[in-house]
């Protein structure tokens, strides 16, 4: 991003740039949507002392190149002005959908894009406005889905398979990995998320009896160390 921006500014020396850096704060690192509820909320605040922002919000699919809004959720208000030192509450409403499974968790992205307003002295100039987007995970848990995230982590199976490390998430929840170690060594290219029912192999030489330690991110955004296991 920095290289691209520097290149762009080198081509446009008369332009100025402004960015919605840390001024716009999203009040959570993830959203857990309980399907038993009609909606869930997310707070967005503007920490700037003077500058307002135009804020756009929507839900998209996790892991997809298409980041357009999905039909399963609506966010209100989808577009609004957020003045300095103010906050607004986004209402996230599940609209349903035939492709949303009711026997396991589904994962989406909650997106918040902030565009800074022009100051009075910028209005008569060529100004490059930079919109920054924050995306956090949104987990939809159908009503009545049983089991905790701690139990889900315990249901992830690990075993040595022909010189690789095989895994199988037998739970109905997503397991977000913070760190994965085999015999005390970091596993390179470990998956970010183990989806419900997902199985696969990691190109790591493993053998039965090796120790595996997993740290995962819980519903509150905290990193939790799971008990060390010996792989089969």
Question: PLM features: residue spans?
Answer:
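Bacterial N-terminal signal peptides that target proteins for export
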Residues: 1-7
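Terminal connector regions
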Residues: 96-145, 210-232
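Short, solvent-exposed loop/turn segments enriched in Ser/Thr/Gly
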Residues: 36-41, 103-107, 161
